[in-house]
């Protein structure tokens, strides 16, 4: 097949809910690329679909846990900005920062950067907690998870240059 000689097929708008269930399932199977592809298909027929946007953002950030994935931080930030709810923008920015920081934990030389990333995520979760809909504990759960990781990994802020000499 010659690149560009074929066109993508459009999904039917009335199948969006079922299709998004498949995207969620692929995320749970640790197949973010397939979830991303499905979300792109949804955007082709419903460009502003907020459920697809959330799944897309989460699938993009899922790539941080894949060793050879090409994570696109600018794309993630761009998609977060498309969320209509300020609460969701702040909350998913926290998730983005948290997942990026957790990926840094895999490299012992990056632990202080992981600390900073988790602290940035915690700050977002604190803001999101104040804005959260009634009976929504999601920002609290994420905040506590970040704090526990900092404690468990004994993460510290970077030493200042003067402290090194």
Annotate the PLM regions.
Residues 6, 127-165:
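Terminal, low-structured helical/coil segments at or just beyond the last alpha-helical repeat
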Residues 13-18, 46-62, 84-107, 137-149:
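Amphipathic alpha-helical repeat scaffolds of TPR domains
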């Amino acid at each position: 097949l010659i690149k560009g000689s074929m066109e993508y097929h459009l999904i039917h708008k009335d199948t969006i809910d079922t299709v998004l269930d498949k995207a969620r399932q692929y995320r749970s199977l640790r197949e973010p690329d397939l979830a991303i592809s499905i979300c792109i298909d949804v955007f082709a027929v419903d460009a502003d679909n907020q459920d697809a946007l959330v799944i897309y953002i989460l699938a993009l950030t899922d790539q941080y846990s894949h060793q050879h994935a090409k994570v696109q931080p600018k794309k993630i930030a761009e998609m977060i900005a498309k969320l209509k709810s300020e609460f969701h923008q702040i909350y998913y920015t926290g998730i983005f920062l948290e997942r990026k920081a957790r990926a840094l934990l895999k490299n012992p030389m990056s632990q202080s950067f992981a600390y900073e990333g988790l602290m940035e995520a915690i700050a977002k979760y604190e803001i999101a907690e104040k804005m959260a809909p009634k009976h929504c504990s999601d920002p609290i759960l994420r905040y506590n998870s970040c704090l526990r990781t900092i404690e468990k990994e004994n993460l510290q802020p970077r030493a200042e240059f003067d402290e090194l000499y």
